Design a protein with these regions (language model features):
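HAMP signal relay modules and closely related sensory coiled-coil linkers
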Residues: 1, 7-29
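A structural signal for long alpha-helical coiled-coils and helix-turn connectors
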Residues: 2-5, 30, 34-37, 41, ...
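Interdomain signal-transducing alpha-helical coiled-coil linkers
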Residues: 19, 26, 31-47, 239
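A specific heptad-register position in long alpha-helical coiled-coils used by two-component signaling proteins
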Residues: 20, 24-27, 31, 126, ...
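PAS-family sensory domains
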Residues: 23-24, 28-29, 103-105, 222
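Generic recognition of well-ordered alpha-helical segments
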Residues: 24, 28, 56, 123, ...
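… and, occasionally, acidic/histidine-rich disordered N-termini of signaling adaptors
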Residues: 39-220, 270-286
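C-terminal catalytic subdomain
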Residues: 159, 212-221, 226-286
């Protein structure tokens, strides 16, 4: 019996001695173990199939094409730590005002429970887009809804922004995500918008930050799984390394910037197991 191989039978004689009874018992145990092993294999196969289906569904829920405007080019990428994850992003267009909006979010926990919470939150946001809320109003409304409807053991960090393509104005509210980065004229600065994670307190308040952008600016939103990725010595990637990616990416389009971020993160961890979902949005003002 090697590596869980129970597919054998012990030969039993026709005598009634104790040894033959023991061998009959061994055969019974082996047959039971064989059935149990096959049952476990079938269960594992069904779980893998369900996770693969959930992963395909989650991929379809993500925007297949990002909105394009005259002055803003956006790219995004999400890499879950497991088959499904709690990070997600989305983009919208406000029909009446003409503003663009978007979000990046990170649900506490990992795997299927986080993915279900993410799907709930994404659906709530989608149902409120027609109201054309500003970022502060969106976070306030979303927080109240999640506080009422979501499980107590989960919460979510999220940044929501609107983009005025005519006036090059970005407005952003942040509920617990790392501070977004702005590259401008050879320097990187943090956008100091703060707020508590969503779903923790019913009456949490959020602030909005308005940025007058300029052509040539690059904006970077990201979840903490990016900067908290560690190398073999347990040193995290960190915001400074992420800022250095932006500094070295001057002249590249948004899609290439996103790829550069993941390339540098992977170089840092040197193929160590990814323990958290990672999501990046890069936007270039043109």
């Amino acid at each position: 019996m090697v590596d869980g191989d129970f597919d054998f039978v012990v030969q039993v004689s026709n005598s009634d001695d104790d040894l033959d009874k023991l061998l009959l018992l061994v055969n019974f145990v082996m047959a039971t173990a064989r059935r149990s092993l096959n049952d476990l294999k079938n269960i594992h196969k069904r779980v893998e199939e369900d996770l693969a289906a959930a992963r395909r569904l989650q991929e379809k829920l993500s925007p297949q094409m990002l909105p394009t405007s005259r002055h803003l080019c956006a790219s995004a990428k999400c890499v879950p730590a497991r088959a499904v994850g709690g990070d997600f992003f989305d983009f919208f267009r406000y029909e009446r005002s003409g503003l663009y909006s978007g979000l990046i979010a990170d649900v506490s926990g990992k795997g299927a429970p986080a993915a279900l919470y993410a799907a709930l939150a994404s659906g709530i946001v989608g149902s409120m887009v027609d109201n054309e809320l500003n970022p502060q109003q969106m976070l306030t409304a979303l927080n109240r809804s999640l506080f009422r409807r979501a499980p107590d053991e989960h919460f979510m960090t999220l940044a929501y922004f609107t983009w005025d393509d005519e006036n090059l104005v970005l407005e952003v509210s942040n509920a617990g995500l790392p501070e977004p980065l702005l590259y401008r004229n050879g320097e990187v600065q943090r956008l100091r918008a703060h707020g508590v994670p969503l779903g923790l307190f019913a009456e949490a308040e959020y602030e909005s930050l308005r940025i007058q952008c300029e052509r040539g600016d690059t904006l970077l939103f990201y979840t903490d799984g990016v900067v908290e990725t560690v190398d073999a010595t347990d040193k995290d990637f960190g915001t400074q390394r992420l800022s250095n990616v932006l500094l070295s990416a001057n002249g590249y389009d948004s899609a290439r910037i996103v790829e550069m971020v993941f390339e540098r993160v992977n170089e840092h961890c040197q193929c160590a197991m990814n323990t958290d979902d990672q999501t990046v949005i890069a936007m270039k003002v043109v």
